[in-house]
Amino acid sequence: EKFKDRALGEYFHPAQGMATSNNERFVRFWWEVDQSKLSLHIEDQLKWKQYSKGGPFNKWYGNNWTVVNWANNGYEIKNFVDESGKQRSAVRNEQFYLNEGVTYTASGSKGASFRLHPANNLFDVGGSCLFSKSDYKNNSYLLAFLNTKLAFYILDCLNPTVNTTQGDLARIPFVIPVKSKEGIVSRLSNHNVRLKKAICAFRIFETNYSNSPLVIFQGSTLKDKVLDYLKFENTCLTQVLLN
């Protein structure tokens, strides 16, 4: 009753992801699959789509290391039944598949953490997402708002447990900002995403991994290379906090 004004759920739909019911069969780490069948674009119709699946506490960007078998528009998953013919898998909110949004880790002692959910990704029940359902479609501002201490405090008041539900997110009070403030916040949010992407580019388990920091950083010794990388990562993370 305290939240009488408009809520987040009026502008964005908190969507629960799919449950394959057999991840050993349908889900892989991206480095385990034939790279020629790894989808990089919506139009390519390749077998393995990137799969937002939650993961450890991590803000802005990352935890992109799993892929799911979506060959023939997910035919195998959609027709996965038990011996009696009863449906085992649950393909939920398919209308939002492959759209950009905001994904989050819903369970953890540190609370929820929110990250960019790139277009061309699918999402798991453990990596549920928020998608625009109105004329307001600024995912950058939404991401910044949800990663604030204010949003964290409100979620903790609504549900003081280690699990954040779709209903909790929908109830958060939300006001569309004035354009000038929205632009500033969105730019800082996008900057944070770029900084986290730069860090992920040196993490071998992330899909945007490019090269080892031991190759890129030009220290004269192994110790110097490691120290240069740690300085780079610390600088990026410090800027994220300042933003």
Residue ranges, per PLM feature:
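S-adenosyl-L-methionine
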Residues: F3-Y11, Q16-D44, K53-N58, W65, ...
